Curated annotation (Swiss-Prot):
Gene name as annotated: folD
Name of the protein described by the UniProt record: Bifunctional protein FolD
Binding residues for NADP(+): G165, R166, S167, S190
Oligomer status and interactors: Homodimer.
UniProt family annotation: Belongs to the tetrahydrofolate dehydrogenase/cyclohydrolase family.
UniProt keyword list: Amino-acid biosynthesis, Histidine biosynthesis, Hydrolase, Methionine biosynthesis, Multifunctional enzyme, NADP, One-carbon metabolism, Oxidoreductase, Purine biosynthesis
EC number(s) from the headed UniProt entry: 1.5.1.5, 3.5.4.9
Species, as recorded: Streptococcus pneumoniae serotype 4 (strain ATCC BAA-334 / TIGR4)
Pfam families registered for this protein in UniProt: THF_DHG_CYH, THF_DHG_CYH_C
CDD domains: NAD_bind_m-THF_DH_Cyclohyd
Pathway noted in the entry: One-carbon metabolism; tetrahydrofolate interconversion
Reaction(s) catalysed (UniProt annotation): (6R)-5,10-methylene-5,6,7,8-tetrahydrofolate + NADP(+) = (6R)-5,10-methenyltetrahydrofolate + NADPH; (6R)-5,10-methenyltetrahydrofolate + H2O = (6R)-10-formyltetrahydrofolate + H(+)
Taxonomy, superkingdom: Bacteria
Amino acid sequence: MTQIIDGKALAAKLQGQLAEKTAKLKEETGLVPGLVVILVGDNPASQVYVRNKERSALAAGFRSEVVRVPETITQEELLDLIAKYNQDPAWHGILVQLPLPKHIDEEAVLLAIDPEKDVDGFHPLNMGRLWSGHPVMIPSTPAGIMEMFHEYGIDLEGKNAVVIGRSNIVGKPMAQLLLAKNATVTLTHSRTHNLSKVAAKADILVVAIGRAKFVTADFVKPGAVVIDVGMNRDENGKLCGDVDYEAVAPLASHITPVPGGVGPMTITMLMEQTYQAALRTLDRK
């Protein structure tokens, strides 16, 4: 029988544990983790994501600030704003909500964030640390998926893992984290030949391709673990993932739903990394 991986329940459990750790940290050291989120413009989806991050930070007992700036902000002004928070020791995590307006160079913005405060894990230095086997900040979606594997007792060693999607945010770091657990990893994408046949060999299938219900039953080996990172709308406007859930769920040993699967874990891992960044400042004193 298929086991549903309940990301919402797991995130709530971890969030509760994080609030306890934060309270203890404050009591013992006086340190309160601080997270600042910079939102450029008024993209409706970005506003929802930022609101959720702020809510989670406050629930964890963090100091939280959302800096809203107009879409007309210049790149130089945005970089100056980031520099201000880089230099302020009260803030341990800095997030710039993506996407950014076209006139702003996204890479320049990510490079401007202090790697020790880059809780998204997108800075090239943190990517390099991950690929060299010494991760500090890990992109939060792959980190959340790894936590799911751990919580549900899913063994990765020696397993065939297929990742569909090669983004720097999910696909590439996901592949590296699976490799670190001794899985045999195939990283695929939309131009992979015979993609369904490649995917059908997977014991572990992680799908992050950004296409509604792209993965159907012929992509999935019976008994596979299926992780759906997608967040799309179907033809009826209903939220759905990159996996055709109704067709695939009966085949899988474990599967994440959309919504309520990977999404809640992403924000929880952002909070955990902010907490860890705060802890590391104690080590540097």
